[in-house]
Amino acid sequence: MAAFLIDECVSFQTYRLISASGFPVKTILDITHSGATDSELFKIAQSQTLIIVTLDSGFGDVRIYPPKSHNGIIVLKAFDLNSLQKCHTVLEMLLKIESEFKGTLFIVDGNKYRKKK
């Protein structure tokens, strides 16, 4: 079963949504200190076979994080509470539809999600 690692920039509402969908979830703060670098977050996710969930668009750069190099990354494109709620609707749909996250980058906004393998 897929398990998720929530970046510290992501709201607790997102944590609850993923957990309520039946998936194991950890926050980066459960594992290490506040202010962990992107590199530290990435290494932890890979070593523990976790899918990263973040608002950090840097994780969407396939030159730095090629899809085949990770267990999965979900980048949420939310800019305020309203857009976050819309992203949650799309994220909930993604979690119901998708079964394979390894090696895939998902970009989630308030209207749709895109995936790159």
Please tell me what each predicted stretch does:
Residues A2-I51:
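N-terminal first-folded block
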Residues H33-G35, L81-S83, Y113-R114:
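A short acidic, often aromatic-flanked loop/helix-cap motif at beta-alpha or helix-coil junctions
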Residues G60-M93:
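Mid-chain, well-packed structural core segment of small domains
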Residues K96-K117:
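Charged phosphate-binding loop/patch that engages nucleotide di/tri-phosphates or the phosphate backbone
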